[in-house]
Amino acid sequence: MLDLSSNRLPNRASLITNRAFSAIERFLHIEAMSGVVLLLAAATALILANSQYTSLYEAFWHTPLGFNFGHFNLSWDLHFWVNDVLMTIFFLVAGMEIRREIHEGALASVKQAILPIVAAIGGVCIPAIIYLSFNFNGGHIYGWAVPTATDIAFALGILALLGKAIPSNLHIILLSLAIIDDIMAVLIIAFFYSTNLDPSGLAIAAAGIALVFFFQWISFASAWLYVLPGAIIWWGLMVTGIHPSLAGVILGMMTPVFPTRNLVSPLTTLSNAIQTLQEKNTNTDLHHISTTLKKMRKGQRDIVAPVIRIQKELHPWVAYGVMPIFAFANAGVSFANFDLASQKSFLIVLGIIIGLCIGKPLGILAASYLAVKSGLCRLPPHVTWTGILLIGFLAGIGFTMSIFVSMLAFQDIAQLNSAKIGVLCGSGLSALAGLGYGLIYIKNNKKTHNKP
C-alpha cells in the first residue's frame, strides 16, 4: 500500500515483484478454500441423484435456455451452458496461470521446469497405462485419459489442511505440476477428443485470434472488449469440432504479461495524484478529490500486468462459482442405474480407481527419481522423496477435471456413470491417502528436527 504521508514511491521492480508474490499466495489460498465448496456441491448432487428428487435433478439440467433475435435462435440446455460455456471461464483462468508461470514462475526457466514437467509426464503416462491394461480389449478404451487429470483445488485444499509444517517448496511443486497437468489435459482434449473436424471453423477461430492481436496493438485496456474475439474463437472451435471451452486457454495464453503501455507512466500518475491530495486547497473539493482518486485507481490498475490483474478478478468467481456449479451439474450419479456385476462397468471403475490411487503417485515418484538420478534436475531445498510421494498422492485427486474428460470420452450413459463413480471413489481414496500420509510425513519431520 502506498504511503500518502511520504513523497517517496517504491520502485517499479519492487511493486511488480510484490504483486507477483501476493498473486501466488492469493491463488493458493483461494484454491485451498474452494475445495470445501466443491466437496459440498458434489455431495449435494450425489444426494439429489439418489433421492426421490432424481428425476427433478436430471430434468433441471436438461432445461433449454437461450434467446431469439429476429430469425436468429440460440438455445442449449443448462448442461451445455455449464460444460461448454461456463467452463470456458475456468480454462481462461487456467490459460492465464500457465502464461504467468511461463513468464515469471516455476516454468520460467528450463532448470526450474524440468522436475514438474517430468513428474507430470510420469503422472499422466502411468495412470493411462494402468487404465488400458484393464480396458484394452473393450469398447471403452477411450477413457484412458480420465485418471490422468488433477483437480488443483482439492489437491491444494488437502495440502492446506496439513498446515504450515509442509515446506513451501512442496506447494510450489504441486502447483507447477498441476499447471503442467492442465496443459497436457488441454492437448489431450484437443488431439484425442475432437472428432469430425471441420476446417472452416479454424478460419473463424483465426479471425478471433487476429482480432485479439489487433485490440492489443491499439492498446485496448478493458478486459470486457475481449469478450467479442473470445466468443468468435469459441464459436470457431465448436464449428471445427474441438471442445469450445478451450477458447479460454487460447485467450488466457494471449493475455499480456507486461503492464499496458501508456503515454504517462502509471507511477507518474500515482505520484501526481498523491501530490494533488496532499495540497491543502483540495481537501474541501469533493469533486476534485473524487477525480484524483479515480486517477489513482487507474494508475494502480495500469501498474499491474493484465495477466495478473484479470486472473485476480476472475479467480474467486471460478473457484467459488464456476467449479462448484460444474460439480453440482455433473457429480450427480445415480447408483440405482449402476451395475457393478457388469464386466465393462467393473473394469472402467477399477481402471480409473487404480490409475488415480496408484498410477499417479507411482508415475510422479518414478519419473522424478529417474530425472534426478540421471542428472537432469535436482530436488529443491527442503524437499525429500517422501514429500514427492505426498505430492503424488494428492495429484491422484482427479475429481472435476477427470469428470470433465470422462464426459468427452464416454457417450454411453452406463459407461459414463461407471467412469464418474470411478473418479469419485479414486479421488476420495487419493484424498484420504494424501491426508493420512501427510500426517505421517509431518510426524517424521518433527522427529528428525528434534534429534540432537
Swiss-Prot record:
Ion transport among keywords: yes
Cell compartments where the protein resides: Cell inner membrane
Main localization (coarse): membrane
Transmembrane segments: 27-47, 78-98, 114-134, 141-161, 172-192, 201-221, 222-242, 316-336, 346-366, 388-408, 421-441
Keyword Nucleotidyltransferase recorded: no
Tree of life domain: Bacteria
Pfam families: Na_H_antiport_1
Bilayer topology term: Multi-pass membrane protein
The entry's keywords: Antiport, Cell inner membrane, Cell membrane, Ion transport, Membrane, Sodium, Sodium transport, Transmembrane, Transmembrane helix, Transport
HAMAP family reported for this sequence: NhaA
Family stated for the protein in its record: Belongs to the NhaA Na(+)/H(+) (TC 2.A.33) antiporter family.
Protein name according to UniProt: Na(+)/H(+) antiporter NhaA
Organism annotation: Bartonella bacilliformis (strain ATCC 35685 / KC583 / Herrer 020/F12,63)
